Amino acid sequence: MARHGDTRSPSPVGSTHSSSRRSRRDDDRYERTKRDDGRSYRRSRSPERRYRERDRESYRRRERSIARRDDYRDEDSYRPIRRDRSRDRRRSRDRGDDRDYRRRSRERDFRCRRDDSRDRARRRADDSTDLKHKSRRDSSRDRPKDSASRSRETSKPATPAPTAVPTDEEKRAERLAKLEAWKQKQAAERERKQREAAAAGGARSLLDEIDRKSGLSPAVGSPQSPATPSTTADATPAPYAGKFDPKAIAKSAAPAQAASNVLGDDVAVPTAVKASATSTTTKVQANKPSTASKASAPLKAKGVVGRFGLGTKQAADMEKSSATKTLGFGEEESTRRKLERLPTPPLDDANDTNKPEDNAEDDDDVDMHEGDTEEQTAAAARAAAERREERLQNEASKTNGDTTMNDAPHSQEGEKMEVDAKEEEEIDPLDAFMSELVETAPPKKTTGAKFSKAKEQQPEAIFGDENDPDITAVGEGDADDFLAIANKAKKKKDIPKVDHAKMEYEPFRKKFYTEPSDLAQMSEGELASLRLELDGIKVRGVDVPKPVQKWSQCGLGVQTLDVIDRLGYENPTSIQSQAIPAIMSGRDVIGVAKTGSGKTVAFLIPMFRHIKDQRPLENMEGPIGLIMTPTRELATQIHKDCKPFLKALNLRAVCAYGGAPIKDQIAELKRGAEIVVCTPGRMIDLLAANAGRVTNLRRVTYVVLDEADRMFDMGFEPQVMKIMANVRPDRQTVLFSATFPRNMEALARKTLNKPVEIVVGGKSVVAPEITQIVEVRNEDKKFVRLLELLGNLYSSDENEDARALIFVERQEAADTLLRELMRKGYPCMSIHGGKDQIDRDSTIEDFKAGIFPVLIATSVAARGLDVKQLKLVVNYDAPNHLEDYVHRAGRTGRAGNTGTAVTFLTEDQERFSVDIAKALKQSGQKVPEPVQQMVDSFLEKVKAGKEKASASGFGGKGLERLDQERDAARMRERRTYKTGEEGEEEEEKEEKNEQAEERFNKVLSSVQSASAPSLPGVPKGIDLDGKITVHRTEKDANGAKNPLDKVGSAVADIHARLSRAGVMRSGVPIDNRGPDAGAFHATLEINDFPQKARWAVTNRTNVAKILEATGTSITTKGSFYPTGKEPGPGENPKLYILVEGETELAVTNAMRELMRLLKEGTLAAADSDARAPVGGRYNVV
């Protein structure tokens, strides 16, 4: 339907304004007769411009004379013929006998279903003229022309009937004749092209080739009319030497229109005239070089001769050639350059208004890019043209068996084009494009015309597989790498191991000590007597320095000596006199001395000298001195001892320990600190924080491990070794402790290099200044004795400011004793590991300041706590080994002061009496008679095998679960990797013993449950307070050595599976023989408990808590049976809970928690029943 503003009646030719307006608006019209044509409505090669109001007065060349716009609507010729093509072409692929049943292009089928002419208008405006000749439309199939055009092309010269439809035989003969003629022409053409290619230039050759194709089309397209004289064809090239006046062309359109109205039909062209037209066209093209690879590029005959004659047709083609010279630039490049040139098109195309047949050709050209991108079209056209040329040369004799005809009456170029169109119909453009992605394009012949962008288009194989990333499922890859990444993400506190071979460390100086002359002149005898006087110093190592006697002999700086004088240190202590010269000589040292002997100063003073010798810290550099301690209290104590020296020496120290906010410690480290006093765990946190950018160990050259034995034994060995591995290997390492068990020496030597071992006063000895009292008392009399001791201490005025420290074994005991003492009027506080770090710090500060005189503590305060006024230490609960006793007693009597240590022993603590008696003997004090009797009694039991002697040292407490887990892991590995040959006899013996034990436990538990009073609601025979029986998972019978036993077990297994008997029958052990079964299991029947109790042990929240706490597996099995009903044979057993775990301890803890929940739920159900009203809510009157 015509758009607004158009009129159906043709306007006079002279009406330029109306003509131009209608021409513009025709751009937006989609004519009804063309609705099924599958091609665009526009008839011009010129770029389309959207209709805008501002374009009305501007110049716009006419597309076509408005007077001639309805010529194709002639009732006698066009309309009846167009009706044949107006049907829906999707209904059948057989649309007529004149079609060779060729496969239809998929894109044309799709394109005809929608009116996308407006969308295609933008795309075709950007397509270069060179690409239009290689359209998809031409490469897919030969689009059927209207009936009049077919008549003109296929009719004989003497047949003027325009509507005659030729038969299939005639058409086939005609095509074969064209093919043979084209073969002859091709040989001569190829030679001429090679000669021309040598003399032709690059870009000019390309444009001339395009012009040649455009100029050739009028002569090859269709036969000429017999009424058209041959002189018209001869004169065709002449008018195109220059440009035309648009007005003159518009005037010449009037007689042409009149002739069209009179003639009313097309006229066939005689054969004689066709020859002259061909020769003329050949002369025109003689001087134009061509590209050999593009010889067959014109894929469609474009010379459809209309009622205006051949001259008009060729004029339009030549004008298009001139436009091509201006606008064609190649494939991708043309889109960008044409966008700049399009606003001012040349006026050579202005006479397109006179040529309706040219508009039909434009339709053909425009149609080539519909529904696809220009890059794909160009690639498809190139590939199709190259393959077509090779195929035509190789298979010219095989085209439908029609290659024998030689008398071709039509022009050779026309035959070539028709054959090309037919061959290209057989190749789908999509297949051609996809094949180009996989196959390498055949090498192009070198000619003057080359596409500069051809290489850049090769990476457009975006649909190919060769460049795709290797997309592999996670499960198919390396699962170990994936798990390693996941584990790495979880280990937030891991610090990377440093490769010291690749690090460049600065050299540093270790040796600062120069032996004084008076010590150098000392003989060996004098040296031995001196060491004996200094509490019997024992040294072990090579070339150990002699002990100093005065601070001036240590080689210290003036600032350090001034601080020492201010602190009141008159002479070095025994450990200081021997350790300071050894450390300042650059040696690694192991120092063992009694408590309160000044070990802290012994390693601090050499460290200050060590740090001052090196260059100052720069921004973001780590510390130089690193001091690690096992407890937070000891860390704060060492940091406090450093402060007097730090101010004088202009150094900085940071105390880093757990429990305190890490952000404050990070801020202090970022400001820079030469010394870090830390606990191992917090140091690893700081090293791993912020991807290692908080601090580093690159400048650490001096490392101190204070109380090293406790640090290694408390489980800090992995952390300590990890930190030490990141410190440079040539560091200086110092270890100090009051006790040093022999099994710790091997661990200490891992971190030291040829150390000097210094032992002062013997290992693990209580200082002689401490008065030790050991009393054997019952549990109920210990508190009264404690009150007596405290009363005696504070009764005298001289002890008014004295402090008392009371040690207990457990946190609960500390809080209980605190409550009792507060009731008796003693102001006191407690400290243990269960309190927050800030509370622990404030409590120790208050205790030192005298805010309260009595402190109750566990062994956490046994080390590093230095209070000068501490006069009394009470071991309310006896220490369990010698080293702990030494450290507890060593809290008093420090720095030469006197003190008292009182220890309470109960009669059942014979095991601890041995170590206490040994400590008394080593310190030179008498062992009380009751204590000696306990020692003798215990040793007798050890000889009789009733008791096992305890080993000295910090063995640790509460590690049974860790041991069981370690053993379980070892057994699991043994089961996984065993060959079935080892250890069978021992395991069988263990199983027999366990089975006997289980039977005994069952009998015992049944007796206990029968005698114990039962809770209301608890089923008969179930004792929630009785012993928990944990079973070891039954071993698979397949492990038996005897083959007959294996056969028998297999038969029994088969029978059990077939009959389903014994699998889920009441009273049979649970089925936990699967691969996921734990090493231990236990069952708890809950079927007969009240509903509240059953819910307490089966709801997800409670079960999740137990699982998290114990690490077991809890499964509800069986079926619920009401009270009084029993499961029959073959039925599921009663509802029960199965608990599985890797250790017996874990299963026992889980069962104990489940029993507690059952008991609470049963009691709650009984209470709710008791509170419930007797009757209902309503009464029936």
From Swiss-Prot:
The protein's name in its UniProt record: Pre-mRNA-processing ATP-dependent RNA helicase prp5
Ranges for domain Helicase C-terminal: 785-935
Ranges annotated as biased composition (Low complexity): 157-166, 222-243, 275-284
Pfam annotation, one family: KH_12
Domain remark from Swiss-Prot or TrEMBL: The Q motif is unique to and characteristic of the DEAD box family of RNA helicases and controls ATP binding and hydrolysis.
Residues holding ATP: 593-600
Segments for region (Disordered): 1-243, 275-423, 949-998
InterPro entries reported in the protein's UniProt record: DEAD/DEAH_box_helicase_dom, Helicase_ATP-bd, Helicase_C-like, P-loop_NTPase, PRP5/DDX46/KHDC4_KH, RNA-helicase_DEAD-box_CS, RNA_helicase_DEAD_Q_motif
Principal localisation: nucleus
GN (gene name): prp5
Compositional bias ranges of the Basic and acidic residues kind: 24-87, 94-155, 168-196, 384-393, 410-420, 958-981
Motif (DEAD box): 706-709
Renumbered ranges of motif Q motif: 549-577
Similarity-based family: Belongs to the DEAD box helicase family. DDX46/PRP5 subfamily.
Record key words, sorted: ATP-binding, Helicase, Hydrolase, mRNA processing, mRNA splicing, Nucleotide-binding, Nucleus
Native source species: Aspergillus terreus (strain NIH 2624 / FGSC A1156)
